[in-house]
From Swiss-Prot:
This is C protein alpha-antigen. Pfam families: AlphaC_N, AlphaC_N2, Gram_pos_anchor, Rib, YSIRK_signal. The gene is bca. Residues 272-281, 354-363, 436-445, 518-527, 600-610, 682-692, 764-774, 846-856 have a biased composition (Basic and acidic residues). The modification Pentaglycyl murein peptidoglycan amidated threonine is found at residue 990. InterPro entries: ACP_C_sf (IPR038335), ACP_N_sf (IPR038544), AlphaC_C (IPR035327), AlphaC_N (IPR014933), LPXTG_anchor (IPR019931), M_anchor (IPR019950), Rib_alpha_Esp_rpt (IPR012706), YSIRK_signal_dom (IPR005877).
């Protein structure tokens, strides 16, 4: 591919383009040349010719050959241009040819009767020609060896791949939808890539492009919808049998699922886990997930077989109870005899809990364990009620002794002591002092024994405590306060509070100190004693002394030492630091004074004497102040500050050169300065009218420099009108087919006021029957004869195309299960409406009856903003409902005959059910099991469960034949009847039944009952 460059000579959109006729002489021949190269066309008075359209390489003597390396655009001597590349700015016509060194070329396109100077003006597909005019190094048209001007025309095919490329991307987007199979997607995408590579690298015609669009449409039809894995494969659930209480893991369940090879389905338990503590069949739902995310559901059956019932769960023994007086022993046998054990259980009771303590009244629970023959055990409780013995009063009641406090020496009577005893209400106990009376002359705690006598003669003993408190000691004898001391500088007053605060008074004494002696005179150095009296709450007092040490006043450092300030001399402008200033201060040895600058710093830019204040601070915080003098001597003035040169000015006509000397001669330098001027700035460009500033530098003997500016006024040459004014072409818009006059065109040209330019149409008039932009060349002639050229654009708007002809909506399709309603919105959402069309879909045809399986076409009308309408069809595929397995298959129950008393298992019953092949139905006994101890026909209900969860019910008949009657039950031998007391009473039976009549009657009754039972069952 190549880039586009601008073709200045033949781009007719350029304003101010001028054409002229020149006669060039080549040897003995003169040739008239037209610079527009529009072969075979007469324009004005220009006779223009054109070379035959052939490959440049076959034109002898031409400086141009076709660039065959660009295979997409040059093949077999012809040129090809894709308007798609033109829109992207990828086409440069000058790169279609290869020129000899130093040669240049200009080009023009011809398509039909139209000529274009720029590739971007190409709009339509079809045949065209591209003509080049070759110029030599001198810029003149190149003349071949045969005397002909070097003009090369190439046959051009213009095509547009834009629609094809859009279609490729549309199909590519569709193919990448996951709903298609990988194989069909790969086939389509590979085909699209092949087509795109072809059009990206090889030249085409518009017919080729249209054929490729058909190819792309055919490729899209190769896309095949993928079948979900769940519809490809048919996993089945298995079954397992475990004893009651045996746990079953998820893995054990999923391992029972049979998943088809190659499906890569992964089973997961999603239903309730089986409770193996409950015997019976447990269905567990397992979900199989395939790689495409679809899922199947199967059922695994866990058969839980019941475990034998232990004796302890068969029988229910109970504990009894008994009542004994307090202290009466109870043996283990007496306890176990109270346990009621069910007959036939053969359980043996044993006391295993604590034996009852019958010394303690109340209910005592005793644990008894009952052990059965199978080793299992039950536990029951026997209750022994122990009734209490009568309790003596002293054990019923709990009197307590009290306490009292009396001052030392205060007597206490027996009544005061017994009044302190608390005797429970209702006990009627009487207290009496029986121990030693307390001696209250002795401080401390005295214990007194008191005896409480109850009405039943029993007695309790308690103690009463008498606390004897000692007489009080005066505070002044209890406590020992001490005086303190303090040190103050001479002249510092000391308050009474400061003195009393120095007295140390024992904690808890509550003593209050008061100064009672002379106050210290702190103006007198030395030790001063001050008497302080401490008064206690009981009014007693103590006296202590406080010492005040008065120290003489010290002399301040600032009065001891005498520092002095120094001086220094510096040149003007030399800075002086604080340290340099403080270093000039003389501070007495040993004073440890520190100098600090506190006054204004000296401005050394100002000559003269500057006083600076320095403060000296001593260790005791006192300060001295001294002055330091800085003498500033003035510095010499440079030449550039002594003198003031000035720049001058001059006026010259445009284009007149000005030398450096002419410029420096304009600088005025003060006499005596000996300054030398030099031009250092840009020299003035006198080709440009206006004021030009030139920088000149003046250098003095001391090396200093000044800078001034010299002004050169350049007066302009007279400007031709065409260069003074800049007319502009306008534009207008007309409907297709509306004629436009020259005046309407020239009226659109904006000519600057005062220019007096006159516009004239000189280019082709616009063909308004052809929609698009038409450029018209207008020439503006000024009074001085100069001319400007501008372009006027006539926009021809095409007749409006109705929206329904612009856009192509398409109907979609959807699949729903039978009976699923489909709303209008769901239907209109399936219509693909082109972006930007703003079309609104509405269902106008019959709504689909989704109760009827099959394909239903629904008409949808798309209404556009301009009111036009399109009609499309949406297809609703209705898939039939699946028939439940129970309606597909018809299992039948069988029958079997067994002797009376022969047990029949569930499996034997379910094996009699005939289940159709392929149904995968599983039979389960759900009705009452047959009692084979009863002869007759027994109906057993069996439920058949199919993979889809639906169920059928059938009946299996079990015929129970009665056992044969043994001879001993058939016959009844009898002895002679015996008479007792002359009456016909029978003797007690000692063996077989006495009368055959009874046996016959009994058999008759039993047979009747049996027949009734069989008859009833048959009716049931």
């Amino acid at each position: 591919m190549f880039r586009r460059s601008k073709n200045n000579s033949y781009d007719t959109s350029q304003t101010k383009q001028r054409f002229s006729i020149k006669k060039f002489k080549f040897g003995a021949a003169s040739v008239l040349i037209g610079l527009s190269f529009l072969g075979g066309v007469t324009q004005g008075n220009l006779n223009i010719f054109e070379e035959s359209i052939v490959a440049a390489s076959t034109i002898p003597g031409s400086a141009a050959t076709l660039n065959t390396s660009i295979t997409k655009n040059i093949q077999n001597g012809n040129a090809y241009i894709d308007l798609y590349d033109v829109k992207l700015g990828k086409i440069d016509p000058l790169q279609l040819i290869v020129l000899e060194q130093g040669f240049t070329a200009k080009y023009v396109f011809r398509q039909g009767t139209k000529y274009y100077g720029d590739v971007s003006q190409l709009q339509s597909t079809g045949r065209a020609s591209l003509t080049y005019n070759i110029f030599g190094e001198d810029g003149l048209p190149h003349v071949k060896t045969d005397g002909q001007i070097d003009i090369v025309s190439v046959a051009l095919t213009i095509y547009d791949s834009t629609t094809l490329r859009d279609k490729i991307e549309e199909v590519r987007t569709n193919a990448n939808d996951p709903k298609w199979t990988e194989e069909s997607r790969t086939e389509v995408l590979t085909g699209l890539d092949t087509i795109k590579t072809d059009i990206d690298n090889n030249p085409k015609t518009q017919t080729d492009i249209d054929s490729k669009i058909v190819e792309v449409n055919e490729l899209e039809k190769l896309l095949v919808l993928s079948v979900p894995d769940k519809d490809k494969y048919d996993p089945t659930g298995g079954e397992t049998t475990v004893p009651q209480g045996t746990p079953v893991s998820d893995k054990e369940i999923t391992d029972l699922v049979k998943i088809p090879d190659g499906s890569k389905g992964v089973p997961t338990v999603v239903g309730d886990r089986p409770d193996t503590n409950v015997p019976g069949d447990h269905k567990v739902t397992v979900e199989v997930t395939y790689p495409d995310g679809t899922k199947d559901t199967v059922e695994v059956t866990v058969h839980v077989t019941p475990k034998p019932v232990p004796d302890k769960d068969k029988y229910d023994p109970t504990g009894g109870e008994t009542t004994v007086p307090q202290g009466t022993p109870v043996s283990d046998k007496e306890i176990t005899d109270l346990v009621k054990i069910p007959d036939g259980s053969k359980g043996v009771p044993t006391v295993v809990g604590d034996r009852p303590d019958t010394n303690v009244p109340g209910d005592h629970k005793v644990t008894v364990e009952v052990t059965y023959p199978d080793g299992t055990k039950d536990t029951v409780e026997v209750t022994v009620h122990v009734t209490p013995k009568p309790v003596p009063d002293k054990d019923k009641y709990d009197p307590t002794g009290g306490e009292t406090t009396v001052p030392q020496g205060t007597p206490v009577s027996d009544k005061e002591i017994t009044d302190l005893v608390k005797i429970p209400d209702g006990s009627k106990g009487v207290p009496t002092v029986v121990g030693d009376r307390p001696d209250t002359n002795v401080p401390g705690d005295h214990k007194v024994t008191v005896e409480v006598t109850y009405p039943d003669g029993t007695k309790d003993t308690v103690e009463v405590t008498v606390h004897v408190t000692p007489k009080p000691v005066p505070d002044k004898d209890k406590y020992d306060p001490t005086g303190g001391e303090t040190t103050v500088p001479q002249g510092t007053p000391v308050s009474d509070k400061e003195i009393t605060d120095l007295v140390k008074i024992p904690d808890g004494s509550k003593g209050v100190p008061t100064v009672v002696g002379d106050r210290p005179d702190t103006n007198v150095p030395g030790d001063h004693k001050v008497t302080v009296e401490v008064t206690y709450p009981d009014g007693t007092k103590d006296t202590v002394e406080v010492t005040v040490h008065v120290t003489p006043k010290p002399v301040p450092d600032k009065d001891k030492y005498d520092p002095t300030g120094g001086e220094t001399t510096v040149p003007q402008g030399t800075p002086v630091s604080d340290k340099e200033i403080t270093d000039l201060v003389k501070i007495p040895d040993g004073s440890k004074g520190v100098p600090t600058v506190v006054g204004d710093r000296p401005d050394t830019n100002v000559p003269g004497d500057h006083k600076v204040t320095v403060e000296v601070t001593y260790p005791d915080g006192t300060k001295d102040t001294v002055e330091v003098t800085v003498h500033v001597t003035p510095k010499p003035v440079p030449d550039k500050d002594k003198y003031d040169p000035t720049g001058g000015e001059t006026t010259v006509p445009q284009g007149t050169p000005v030398s450096d000397k002419e410029i420096t001669d304009l600088v005025k330098i003060p006499d005596g300065s000996k300054g030398v001027p030099t031009v250092v700035g840009d020299r003035p460009d006198t080709n440009v009218p206006g004021d030009h500033k030139v920088t000149v530098e003046v250098t003095y003997p001391d090396g200093t420099k000044d800078t001034v500016e010299v002004t050169v006024h350049v007066t302009p040459k007279p400007v031709p009108d065409k260069d003074k004014y800049d007319p502009t072409g306008g534009e207008t818009t007309v409907p297709q087919g509306t004629p436009v006059s020259d005046k309407e065109i020239t009226d659109l040209v904006k000519i600057p006021d005062g220019s007096k330019g006159v516009p004239t149409v000189v280019g082709d008039r616009p063909d308004t029957n052809v929609p698009g932009d038409h450029k018209v060349t207008v020439e503006v002639t000024y009074p001085d004869g100069t001319k400007d050229t501008v372009e006027v654009t006539v926009h021809v708007t095409p007749k409006p195309v109705p929206d329904k002809d612009k856009y192509d909506p398409t109907g979609g399709e959807t699949t729903v299960p039978q009976g699923t309603p489909v709303s209008d919105k769901e239907i209109t959402d399936l219509v693909k409406i082109p972006d930007g069309s703003k079309g609104v879909p509405t269902v106008v045809g019959d709504r689909p009856d989704t109760n009827v399986p099959g394909d239903h076409k629904v008409t949808v009308e798309v209404t556009y903003p301009d009111g036009t309408k399109d009609t499309v069809e949406v297809t609703v595929h209705v898939t039939p409902k699946p028939v439940p397995d129970k309606d597909k298959y018809d299992p039948t129950g069988g029958e079997t005959t067994v002797p009376q008393g022969t047990p029949v298992s569930d499996k034997e019953i379910t094996d009699l059910v005939k289940i159709p092949d392929g149904s995968k139905g599983v039979p389960t006994v759900v009705g009452d099991r047959p009692d084979t101890n009863v002869p007759g026909d027994h109906k057993v209900t069996v439920e058949v469960t199919y993979p889809d969860g639906t169920k059928d019910t059938v009946e299996v008949t079990v015929h129970v034949t009665p056992k044969p009657v043994p001879d001993k039950d058939k016959y009844d031998p009898t002895g002679k009847a015996q008479q007792v007391n002359g009456k016909g009473n029978k003797l007690p039976a000692t063996g077989e039944n006495a009368t055959p009549f009874f046996n016959v009657a009994a058999l008759t009754i039993i047979s009747s009952v049996g027949l009734l039972s069989v008859s009833k069952k048959k009716e049931d």
